[in-house]
């Protein structure tokens, strides 16, 4: 049995990727930087870049993160790895060991007893290392701010690069924080932090 030809026009499937709602084209399709790269590659067959640009590009595309889930925010952190959000498509893959990680996500209430463990794990991470503070409890103590046993913000123990607000913050908020971290790495470079 042969397929029957349709009398109407054939509609191509929508392009994949993030589309600009104003133009309907993929985001970055008319970015001058990418147009310059495309022209240089088609003209010369290779692309010239500085070592710092190459290292920064590689680092932002392969950030390995480890969890330091202390409370309910860790559930949202797990959700960002699931198929709906799939943070790995942005090059953000989980690791179990701090020695293999570039990013640590602190999610939840940090107590005085847990603070030395947090610092020890942070010190085991290779340079350059980044920390995302996720949720009100990690950012400033949250609901337990006035408790005698709570550290009022994990920035008192380790330096924080990105703060993700919320109680608990949504998976979208964490994903946005990851994208902000990648933007920060691109802006500051990697050779010198």
Swiss-Prot record:
The gene is nuoB. InterPro entries: NADH_UbQ_OxRdtase-like_20kDa (IPR006137), NADH_UQ_OxRdtase_20Kd_su (IPR006138). Belongs to the complex I 20 kDa subunit family. It is an enzyme of class 7 (translocase). Signal peptide: none annotated. Keywords: 4Fe-4S, Cell inner membrane, Cell membrane, Iron, Iron-sulfur, Membrane, Metal-binding, NAD, Quinone, Translocase, Transport, Ubiquinone. Binds 1 [4Fe-4S] cluster. NDH-1 shuttles electrons from NADH, via FMN and iron-sulfur (Fe-S) centers, to quinones in the respiratory chain. The immediate electron acceptor for the enzyme in this species is believed to be ubiquinone. Couples the redox reaction to proton translocation (for every two electrons transferred, four hydrogen ions are translocated across the cytoplasmic membrane), and thus conserves the redox energy in a proton gradient. It is a peripheral membrane protein. Its EC number is 7.1.1.-. One of its GO terms (biological process) is aerobic respiration. NCBIfam families: nuoB_fam (TIGR01957), PRK06411.1 (NF005012). It catalyses: a quinone + NADH + 5 H(+)(in) = a quinol + NAD(+) + 4 H(+)(out). It comes from Bradyrhizobium sp. (strain ORS 278). [4Fe-4S] cluster binds at residues 72-73, 137, 167. NDH-1 is composed of 14 different subunits. Subunits NuoB, C, D, E, F, and G constitute the peripheral sector of the complex. One of its GO terms (cellular component) is respiratory chain complex I. Disulfide bonds: none annotated. This is NADH-quinone oxidoreductase subunit B.
